[in-house]
């Protein structure tokens, strides 16, 4: 049941954001937001 639940959750997360736009999962999505907003935190801009 747990595995089925996990398989059900993952596709939904994948469909929420295009794969090319989200290469690093949640971390990648967060970095993309920083890049779009001009990345105000210098150390994170790399």
Curated annotation (Swiss-Prot):
Provide a GO CC annotation, any one.
Answer: extracellular region
Q: Indicate yes or no for the key word ATP-binding.
A: no
The subcellular location is: Secreted
Q: Which UniProt keywords apply?
A: Amidation, D-amino acid, Disulfide bond, Hydroxylation, Ion channel impairing toxin, Neurotoxin, Secreted, Signal, Toxin
- Identify the stretch(es) annotated as Disordered: 1-29
| Stretch forming the signal peptide | 1-6
Give the D-tryptophan positions (modified residues): 41
| Tissues showing expression | Expressed by the venom duct.
Q: Which residues carry this modification: Cysteine amide?
A: 45
Question: Pro-segment residues?
Answer: 7-37
Record PTM 4-hydroxyproline, positions in chain:
40
Q: Which GO terms describe its molecular function?
A: ion channel regulator activity; toxin activity
- Listed as disulfide-bonded, the cysteine pairs are 39-45
Q: Give the family per the record.
A: Belongs to the O2 superfamily. Contryphan family.
Q: What is known of its domains?
A: The cysteine framework is C-C.
Q: What else is known?
A: Exists in two forms, due to cis-trans isomerization at 39-Cys-hydroxyPro-40. The cis conformation is the major form.
Explain the purpose of this protein. Its target is unknown, but this toxin may modulate voltage-activated calcium channels (Cav) or calcium-dependent potassium channels (KCa).
Would you tell me the protein name for this molecule?
Answer: Contryphan-C
Organism this protein belongs to? Conus caracteristicus (Characteristic cone)
């Amino acid at each position: 049941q747990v595995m089925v639940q996990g398989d059900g959750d993952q596709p939904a997360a994948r469909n929420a954001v295009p794969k090319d736009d989200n290469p690093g999962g949640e971390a990648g999505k967060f970095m993309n937001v920083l890049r779009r907003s001009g990345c105000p935190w210098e150390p994170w801009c790399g």
